[in-house]
Amino acid sequence: TLVNNEVSKPLFDMAKGETPFEINSRIGYSGDSSSDISLKPLNYEQKDEKVAFSGGEFQLNADRDGKAISLSGEAQSGRIDAVNEYNQKVQLTFNNLKTDGSSTLASFGERVGNQKLSLEKMTISVEGKELALLEGMEISGKSDLVNDGKTINSQLDYSLNSLKVQNQDLGSGKLTLKVGQIDGEAWHQFSQQYNAQTQALLAQPEIANNPELYQEKVTEAFFSALPLMLKGDPVITIAPLSWKNSQGESALNLSLFLKDPATTKEAPQ
């Protein structure tokens, strides 16, 4: 149970003085652990900002070394009220959020595994009028090790059963994105460089307190580290990206074969 102190007081305020979450853990003789995490209902209001959360129940399992981890659980609902940069009141709500996933730590220091996230409904409203309604959203991701555990093949599946914008039914969509032949060591180097650069940005108040400048610098950090990912000549495949509505259905299939600039002998175009 979380202790109420100066650091955690804002969380207790949101939970009306109650502990915002409780964790009950069990550790076996092998050192493996299982934890039941109970997130308590939250209600927070300050001026034009409001946050309401139904609470949720999650279970976290880990082996003794923390190399194998799984997390599953669900939250019934949540709502956020805020004011955007145009001084408009914006409200976001969600219903029935569920997650289920597991991962293991690979030899090169990055995690691989499976993750699934689903959301029954999400609404976005501006000035009391519904702008968008998304129903039946599901994201599934997986990554597998090949070539003696040195290479990653990954896949992301996204589906949306219904999208309505200003009460107009725009249809449903699906996306399957595959990225193969990712060099594990290169991915680790990319991750370390990118994370180090973004953490350095947060230590600079003139950047961290300017959202537009911060996003610009984060993008620069991403693209400066991106060439590291080209080791192994990864392949990106989109098959399909499809959208279906009352007018019909359209689909796109695309494959990109990337080359490591350090190994290519062709002159840049």
Q: Language-model segments: what does each one mean?
A:
Residues 1-269:
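Glycine-rich, small/hydroxylated-residue low-complexity segments
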